[in-house]
Amino acid sequence: MHSTTPISSLFSFTSPAVKRLLGWKQGDEEEKWAEKAVDSLVKKLKKKKGAMDELERALSCPGQPSKCVTIPRSLDGRLQVSHRKGLPHVIYCRVWRWPDLQSHHELKPLECCEFPFGSKQKEVCINPYHYRRVETPVLPPVLVPRHSEYNPQLSLLAKFRSASLHSEPLMPHNATYPDSFQQPPCSALPPSPSHAFSQSPCTASYPHSPGSPSEPESPYQHSVDTPPLPYHATEASETQSGQPVDATADRHVVLSIPNGDFRPVCYEEPQHWCSVAYYELNNRVGETFQASSRSVLIDGFTDPSNNRNRFCLGLLSNVNRNSTIENTRRHIGKGVHLYYVGGEVYAECVSDSSIFVQSRNCNYQHGFHPATVCKIPSGCSLKVFNNQLFAQLLAQSVHHGFEVVYELTKMCTIRMSFVKGWGAEYHRQDVTSTPCWIEIHLHGPLQWLDKVLTQMGSPHNPISSVS
């Protein structure tokens, strides 16, 4: 009796070098894909003397120092393996260290690495032990005073209201990434389809975008790296000359907090880190999408498998849909990829058309007006929320009253339109005038705010639709 052998297997051959390297593979999924990725790498490394030996040394002795193992950088920075494109250091970190790795945002190079992916050199290091995985920082609890020493006359509410109502333009300012982002990032990535602007604050102040006025300042104008000021407050946000008041100048205005007389309120990660609602003009369409995966794709296609990592807008129907909306929906395409990594939220435009984002947290970090709408071109990504920044602002705000803390709820909502933008440079004044847009609610920060506000008790001035 003869066994039947597929014709393809007669001609398939795995080299001994590939077999050895696959011995260190992590996880048991996508065996064929991993084999092809390693085979592609071996062909490149065999052209370099000692490269294969160095890689095997790194994989067999992960605790020992090892040298860079490099391959040439492609034009777009990516590597294609079996009809899938990805960044090379991400691919090989996934093969040999972290099978669940989703994005380059989750990786940081070690100091010993001479050719990290972000260094714009002709060679890229793919040694998986020259990268570390970003850890989610532990946020310190917010200390809420047990006894209210709050003086409404010294509240920063006027400053927040100034930015939120009186000074907010009828049409938001616009900024385009990366042109308007003049502050150089601490660790910039090269321009590529997976280019991410993952800036962390380097200096105490950020430049305004070319279209942003120098005043009024954002109500959140504090350095991220500077510890919160002592409990000082000013009566108004600006002097008669229109310049922002230096909070450190009025050192005689002190809100006394008895030492140790406070309740700590801790941050907790919710089951669903965000929810996404889809709108067409001012009409809500479909059910709210609850995101449990840290990597979520929002696209214009249909997905009959009901993948929990995808929110497919192509499935949603609307009897009031006009031709402009229909045409816009056809251009959403691959849409936007949302990542929640290390306490930070990134939005990556994977559509062929730009996306437009309004995030107060992002605008604060870059010194823009709070209502600024940022254009993210195809192939670029932007950090749209930073938990550590939010934690610091919340810790500062609890000493200025209920209303000031409540204002931070606006930071926990991100609005994003597809294909069509809005603001001063567009004929659409408001996001509700754009054909297709989404509203993202960040559950962790919102629930943290809710717990802090509950501890603070009722506001001195009741919150209303006009407050």
Swiss-Prot record:
CDD domains per record: MH1_SMAD_1_5_9
Localisation per UniProt entry: Cytoplasm; Nucleus
GO biological process, one term: cell differentiation
Taxonomic path: Eukaryota, Metazoa, Chordata, Craniata, Vertebrata
Keyword set includes Transcription regulation: yes
Region of interest (Disordered), residue spans: 174-246
Source organism: Homo sapiens
Chief location bin: cytoplasm
Keyword annotations from UniProtKB, A to Z: Cytoplasm, Disease variant, DNA-binding, Metal-binding, Nucleus, Phosphoprotein, Transcription, Transcription regulation, Zinc
GO cellular component term, pick one: cytoplasm
Record field: compositional bias (Low complexity): 205-220
Domain annotation MH2: ranges: 273-467
Keyword Transcription: yes
UniProt GO MF annotations: DNA-binding transcription factor activity; DNA-binding transcription factor activity, RNA polymerase II-specific; I-SMAD binding; metal ion binding; RNA polymerase II cis-regulatory region sequence-specific DNA binding
Record-linked PROSITE patterns: MH1, MH2
InterPro entries hit by this protein: Dwarfin, MAD_homology1_Dwarfin-type, MAD_homology_MH1, SMAD-like_dom_sf, SMAD_dom_Dwarfin-type, SMAD_FHA_dom_sf, SMAD_MH1_sf
Subunit structure comment from the entry: Interaction with the co-SMAD SMAD4. Interacts with PEBP2-alpha subunit. Interacts with RANBP3L.
Post-translational modification: Phosphorylated on serine by BMP (bone morphogenetic proteins) type 1 receptor kinase.
Function: Transcriptional modulator activated by BMP (bone morphogenetic proteins) type 1 receptor kinase. SMAD9 is a receptor-regulated SMAD (R-SMAD).
Disease: Pulmonary hypertension, primary, 2: A rare disorder characterized by plexiform lesions of proliferating endothelial cells in pulmonary arterioles. The lesions lead to elevated pulmonary arterial pression, right ventricular failure, and death. The disease can occur from infancy throughout life and it has a mean age at onset of 36 years. Penetrance is reduced. Although familial pulmonary hypertension is rare, cases secondary to known etiologies are more common and include those associated with the appetite-suppressant drugs.
Family membership: Belongs to the dwarfin/SMAD family.
Tissue: Expressed in heart, brain, placenta, lung, skeletal muscle, prostate, testis, ovary and small intestine. Also expressed in fetal brain, lung and kidney.
UniProt domain MH1: residue ranges: 16-140
Top-level taxon of the source organism: Eukaryota
Positions with a binding annotation for Zn(2+): C68, C113, C125, H130
Protein name: Mothers against decapentaplegic homolog 9
